[in-house]
Amino acid sequence: MSSFNLVQIVPTLDSGGVERGTVDVANFLAEKKIKNFIITSGGKMIKELDDNFTQVHQLPVASKNFFSYPLIARKINQFIKANNINIVHVRSRGPAWIINLMTKNNIKTIATFHNVYGGNSYLKKMYNKGLSKMDHLVAISEYVKKTIVKKYNLLPNKISVINRGIDTEYFNQSLDAETKDNIIKNHKIDTAKKIILFPARITSWKGQLEFIDVITKMDTQNIIVLFAEIQKMRAIQI
């Protein structure tokens, strides 16, 4: 492939690990002065992108309506041809099915499995399997790779493991004292104790219950755990 021309497809760019990874990849390419594209239905994280190098094209790719997928696929195909895109990276199951409706001539497709995706019904399993039909797959851990190899009968060499990370420079190191004091006061945090932060959406598969099960087996007299999601934080003294 003589040139690298990437589009990432993600349902929304509001918040979350999938969205953060999409923005981080786009900004890395922008730092290298490599033009790239994102197709999304929108979101507040768009403002974090460098519009000199990253072009955002808004389409309703967050839709769960399968009847709308052929029309969306046609529009994506037109966008790909108009911009000479040759690599398509889908980051969610819905967009994967949309791409599967396209004729994928002259493009390579990649999908990231950000988790193993639950669901025991036939329809749910089929929906989840859409990601596996791309040319190459990324798994965020060895566990995810082993699980999807077994679940979808995939060849291991079709999957690359790329562990998730964070850009520590993104976080505000100079948080003012008043903001810190307000957080401590609002959540009744005893600062004399060790504070553990678990940042993730509160849901059954993010691991909070397993974490609590482990932490309660320790000496917890001097520990406070903070479970934090976007615009919401819960302090639990264990």
Residue ranges and their predicted role:
Residues 89-96, 113:
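Short His-centered aromatic/hydrophobic patch
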